[in-house]
Amino acid sequence: MRTKTLLGLTLDELTSLVQELGEPKYRAKQLAEWLYVKRATTLDEMTNLPKALRSKLKSCCTIGRSPVALTQVSRDGTEKYLFRKLDRPDQTFETVYIPEEDGRATLCISSQVGCRMGCRFCATGQMGFHGHLSAADVINQVLSVPHSDALTNVVFMGMGEPLDNYKVVASVLEIMTSDYGLAWSPKRITVSTVGPRVGLTRFLEEQRANLAVSLHSPFPEERAEIMPVEGLFPIEEVIETLGKYDFSGQRRLSFEYIVFGGLNDDLRHAKALVELIRPLRSRVNLIPYHPIDGLPYHASDRAVIERFAEYLNAQGVIATIRRSRGQDIDAACGMLSTLKPLS
């Protein structure tokens, strides 16, 4: 049997594994508890499993826990962690921990090394695509960061397009929200996306986590200039798809709108944005652009962003301005990149 990584396996997958090893099905729940509740890092810790089973597991499996390789701490308390990919230690990806003064804490996790969506304003997009993360790589971020027990929210807003790696993201969402796993409410989790057609439809049909759609311009031609995927997944088609689903319950829909100075921050854009998303029960997160070396974009003035938000709210579209966090350590929105080698 080929070496298998236990972390990231769903209960069904663990059940198949223990049955292949000639063990009863209930051992799978015990194994899941050790992996996701007790967070074991070695098989020897799993003391309620028979020694014979532990021996079998050692011969065919590894746990798959991976420690943080590098930590950076921002002046505002944000922390950025570098992880190595389990099957390719030469490849790395980043995770961001964002504590709030009210006691909440959000973890921004990655789903790919780099990204193939190619957004022209994004440091991750400039990396190109270097591979999908495994379910073990993704759930390990949640389990292995220093403040894991303090987390109140997880957002798939790190490196990569989550719905381009849908199968893995779906497994992680199951583990995070199931009783055998972390037992989180889906409303504590948000998945961000540009809206790839197949992944978006599957997510809307199968998941109950919150959805955040990267919009950034209400005009297709202009959006295509900064987001080449507009040609593959037109925003109007994404809006049409979203309109088929109910967001009046616990699952929330939001639109991410990075505000660029002189590009998408005027009244014309605000009016078009209202018209585009008015049919949907949603909100808009306005995100100040974080300048990246070598890219031709700059941030909009705070007063301009505030006027933009005021207009949206006056038109009945709930809009908030996201506070920038971790900019001094390149941990803010759009700044994650591992092109530089480990120091």
Question: What spans do the regions from the language model cover?
Answer:
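Auxiliary Fe-S-binding modules of radical SAM enzymes
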Residues: 1-93, 243-252, 257-343
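Short linear Ser/Thr-Pro motifs
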Residues: 74, 110-111, 192, 214
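Generic beta-strand structural signal
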Residues: 79, 93, 105-109, 117, ...
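Residue-level structural signal for beta-strand termini and adjacent loop
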Residues: 97-98, 168
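Canonical Radical SAM [4Fe-4S] cluster-binding loop centered on the CxxxCxxC motif
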Residues: 99-137
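Ferredoxin-type iron-sulfur electron-transfer modules in oxidoreductases and energy-metabolism complexes
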Residues: 136-148
